[in-house]
Amino acid sequence: MAAKDVVFGGEARARMVEGVNILANAVKVTLGPKGRNVVLERSFGAPTVTKDGVSVAKEIELKDKLQNMGAQLVKEVASKTNDIAGDGTTTATVLAQAIVREGAKYVAAGLNPMDLKRGIDKAVAALVEELKKQSKATTTSKEIAQVGSISANSDESVGSIIAEAMDKVGKEGVITVEEGKSLANELDVVEGMQFDRGYLSPYFINNPEKQVALLDNPFVLLFDKKISNIRDLLPTLEAVAKAGRPLLIIAEDVEGEALATLVVNTIRGILKVVAVKAPGFGDRRKAMLEDIAILTGGKVIAEEVGLALDKVTLEDLGQAVRIEIGKENTTIIDGAGQAAEIEARVKQIRIQIEEATSDYDREKLQERVAKLAGGVAVIKVGAATEVEMKEKKARVEDALHATRAAVEEGIVAGGGVALLRAKQAVGDLKTGDAEQDAGIKLIMKAIEAPLREIVANAGGEPSVVVNAVLNGSGNYGFNAANDTYGDMLEMGILDPTKVTRTALQNAASVASLLLTTEAMIAESPKAEGGPAMPDMGGMGGMGGMGM
């Protein structure tokens, strides 16, 4: 086992604070509408240019092990805030740095770190309550667009395309971000339920122009096994033919004689039928078949529920207004399922989302909710170069997260104003314990940091602006984009409450850990340069070559 260095007390904290400062100073230059760019080296290809705080934080690894520990803890603040709220990473980093810097002074002056921590926790709890009171629900498309624009570093085109996407697929719908092919951002919306399986034979195509099979007012047969024997299908086909309507068969697979018979019937015009494979694999396939059954008002024909293929009646089949089957996708529009049953299914999947442990499972479950609840929108990001594309895509994804957070918990005045107003409302919070009160005072000073940083990045004088904002009331604040004062909400400068709240809570949590650190253990640095090479026999005069 390698030897370790152990560092105690003030020295340990001082080294950690140095690491915190290095990381925070690199991240905080990106804050605000006039935030600067940071260039990240890439081992291959062109460097990446970004204004995204979490991207900068993720790149930082320091040579000094103790400094690096401090930096990594603050990196945790940024990434945790990003995971929960999707934005606010730079704000969280700036707050963490301010709390650590103020707190380190108090600890150095001999105050008890544990009492300081208790004071910090009380102040944060009071501020969070106040933020919730200030919060205003996000209802209009305009507000959604403003939140998106602010998060995408004041890019209005991003805000408006996110608002449009939410309009089309609803607040719960799935919105994905992809790299586009053109210079401008584009929005594609798929209404109804779409899954990634197409027709099993091109002979099913009845619209040669679009190369798709269109079924109007069809029945839907859902079967969880392979169909290879046409005899099992005959009763269903006869009943559907009598009703004079088309049929979509979704099964694990349709092969051999069964597929050939369906194709022949379609070509001869005896029956309009299309077969597709069921989406997904294993348990996910079962769940998705069940989703389609609920959406279309049918049943999944499976032996485990006592239903056999040759005993199927028209009542067991699902129905839809229209189904479009392409080479790779099938879209069911306006299924005949009961709204209450669909709603119950969505609730059930939401519970599974909360319990899901992996991001992959969570994402797949969210897709299922969207398919049942409304549709899927795809934002295609346009850019001139690959470097710009990467930077823009990251910003659009951030903006999308922030917008979802705004819809979830509402909005507060942006630009660091909400925290100052919360500070004023909490007023003179006292606990009766001098050291805990010092913790409260420390937080009340630290929450000015985001506004100070925004002003500094815009080339202004932070103290002057902070005093001017504190003398105002309500949503009165400073617009760094054009150096004016006014109502932040009216100027469209807003932050999702969830983002501001999460940034404050995570920053205080990690800063408290740093302040209550009393010892640090890190591997000792290895001595530079190995031992000299031994004499090389037979090569006189070259012995002891220093390497």
Swiss-Prot record:
Keyword ATP-binding tagged: yes
GO biological process: protein refolding
Compartments reported by the entry: Cytoplasm
Domain of life (superkingdom): Bacteria
GO cellular component: cytoplasm
Catalytic reactions on record: ATP + H2O + a folded polypeptide = ADP + phosphate + an unfolded polypeptide
Protein's UniProt keywords contain Chaperone: yes
Pfam families, per the entry: Cpn60_TCP1
MF GO annotations: ATP binding; ATP-dependent protein folding chaperone; isomerase activity; unfolded protein binding
Keywords associated with the record: ATP-binding, Chaperone, Cytoplasm, Isomerase, Nucleotide-binding
Complexes and interactors: Forms a cylinder of 14 subunits composed of two heptameric rings stacked back-to-back. Interacts with the co-chaperonin GroES.
Function: Together with its co-chaperonin GroES, plays an essential role in assisting protein folding. The GroEL-GroES system forms a nano-cage that allows encapsulation of the non-native substrate proteins and provides a physical environment optimized to promote and accelerate protein folding.
Name of the protein this chain belongs to: Chaperonin GroEL
Organism: Delftia acidovorans (strain DSM 14801 / SPH-1)
Gene name as annotated: groEL
